[in-house]
């Protein structure tokens, strides 16, 4: 049977034009394309506060991707916002936090990318460097302007992880 892969979505407030102030739910198309290419069925999971919906997401999906996105509100992991932070949506953070907890209860496969791995970290009790350059030594470029399919850094995947 073809696996259904739930993909967390993000929130953007329109900042110009006809729909100024409207909130949009989105995910980058790359996530959808990758799931389809791997033989899965992508299912976008809008952020909801309703516990019953979150539980149902976890039941329906065979695996999950916590997608990349904006900054997580540092208040949620016991810190104060650094001046370098971009916009954040605490409601989105709380909804994705609850989704992540439910995914962890299911023990189903989970791939967390960028914001997703940061979210997983704080849900499990970790903290974050809000400004990666503040750690005091050179770091790799984290926002590339080259084509997305270009390789920028190695990734090691542990067997059975």
What are these regions (language model features)?
Residues 1-111, 122-129, 133-160:
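N-terminal beta1-alpha1 cap of cysteine-dependent amidohydrolase-like domains
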Residues 114:
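Conserved G/P- and acidic residue-centered "switch" motifs that form tight phosphate/ATP-binding loops
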Residues 117-120:
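Hydrophobic, aromatic-enriched interface-forming segments
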């Amino acid at each position: 049977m073809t696996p259904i892969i739930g993909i967390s979505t993000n929130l953007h407030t329109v900042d110009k034009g006809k729909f100024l102030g409207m909130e949009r739910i989105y995910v980058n198309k790359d996530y959808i394309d990758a799931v389809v290419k791997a033989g899965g069925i992508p299912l976008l999971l809008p952020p909801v506060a309703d516990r019953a919906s979150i539980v149902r997401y976890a039941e329906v999906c065979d695996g999950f991707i916590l997608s990349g996105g904006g900054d997580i509100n540092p208040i949620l992991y016991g810190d104060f916002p650094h001046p370098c932070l971009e916009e954040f949506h605490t409601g989105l953070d709380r909804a994705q936090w609850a989704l992540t907890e439910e995914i962890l209860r299911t023990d189903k496969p989970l791939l967390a990318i960028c914001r997703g791995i940061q979210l997983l970290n704080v849900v499990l009790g970790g903290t974050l460097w809000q400004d990666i350059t503040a750690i005091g030594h050179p770091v790799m470029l984290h926002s590339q302007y080259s084509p997305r399919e270009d390789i920028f850094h190695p990734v090691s995947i542990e067997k059975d992880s």
